[in-house]
Each structure stands twice: as structure tokens, then as C-alpha cells.
Amino acid sequence: MRKVFPRPEILGRLYFCGFDVVSEQYIHDRYCVIAQKKRQPSQEQHRYGLLIRLRRIGKDGNKFNVFKFRTMYAYSEYLQTYVYENNDLDVGGKFNDDYRVTEWGHFLRKTWLDELPMFINMFKGQMKLVGVRPLSQQYYDLYTPELQQLRIKTKPGLLPPFYVDMPDTLEEIQESERKYLEAYLEHPFRTDWKYFWKIVGNILFKGKRSK
């Protein structure tokens, strides 16, 4: 019995197996990919059910598994660099035209339901309620070295300063996070208390959402 794989999973499986995609094209209504072997296959093991674990950078630079409801096709996490190089970033720091997200995933993200499992990380002491979002290695590498070091001084959070400042560009996102982190390191409780109520107010009463 033949199984049809969606495009993101095809590309993700190639990167998982150590290939880099050179080009994609349709030839006589057939989807074709040219790829080049670059490295050894990943040794990571995955279960692509409803609940997934994503490797993120936490306090002191330690990597941990963030729990989320799956919103993307299987193996999509291996396409971050490829999507960034070909699509760049959209307003708000998200990938432009991110075809890795499923139709159901768009709904989960719009309603924030995909992030509910991150309370598991908070209960495990890996995250806190307010703080900068835990980043993948690929996205973390886009930040300035100064902000990278500042970020790993604290635990990441569920409610980011993004919803206070609503920055558009990567530079503005970094400035928003820098402002929060510097304030937090000086006055931890006061800063998180102030940011929490600003975030809640902006989301509930001003309708602010990630773009």
C-alpha cells in the first residue's frame, strides 16, 4: 500500500537523514527534489503523536525538551534553517509563509492551545510564567552574542515580553527582550509582576496577538 507524504515531511526526512536540499521542482506533475549528502543521519528518536517534545535552550545554555501539542507535519523541526534561508522572517519574527504548519495547527496556534503542555515544563522547574520564549538553536543563533549570554541567565517563560511591546522585526524583538531581561535581573519579582499584568491586559482587552 502506497503512502503519500506531504512536502514538509519529505524535506524534513531528507535533512534528518543528513541531506541538504539543493532544489525542488515539478517535472510532468511529479514532485522532484535534488539533495546532497552532507552529514551523518540524526540519532534522535521521535514519536510524532499529538504531544511532541522540542529541544530548546534554557537557563545556563542547557537544552531541554519543551512540551507542545503538534502543529506541524512530522520532521518539520529539521527544516528551520532551510525555511529561514528561503522564506526569511515575517513581521513579528515568525517565518514567512511557513508551509510546515498544518491546517489544524493554525487553529491551535491562534487559540494558544498548542502551548498548554508547556505548563509541564513550568512544574518541572525548567520554565517560569513570565519570561523570554525558549528558542531553538537555529533561532538562537540569529541573536547577537550579547543577548545570547543575557538570555541564558534566566529561565525562559510562558508569557513573553513580546506581548508588551509587540515588536515587528528581529532587531525590535531583541531590544524588547533585552529591556525585559535587564529589568528582571535587577528586580525579578517586581518586573515579572508588572509584565504579567501588561501582557494579560494587552491580550484580553486590546486583542494583541502574535503575527
Task: List where the protein language model places each region.
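Short alpha-helix
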Residues: 1-18
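A hydrophobic, helix-centered structural microdomain
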Residues: 16, 22-79, 189-211
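Hydrophobic structural segments characteristic of membrane proteins
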Residues: 43-44, 117-211
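Conserved glycosyltransferase catalytic-site signature
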Residues: 7-8, 28-30, 101, 113
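Short, glycine-rich, amphipathic interfacial segments at transmembrane boundaries or analogous
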Residues: 54-99, 159-179
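Aromatic-acidic/polar surface patches that form glycan- and anion
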Residues: 2-3, 93-100, 108-109, 186-189
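Short, conserved beta-strand/loop elements in beta-sheet-dominated catalytic cores
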Residues: 100-125
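Short, well-ordered beta-strand elements within core beta-sheets of diverse protein domains
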Residues: 55, 104-110, 182-184
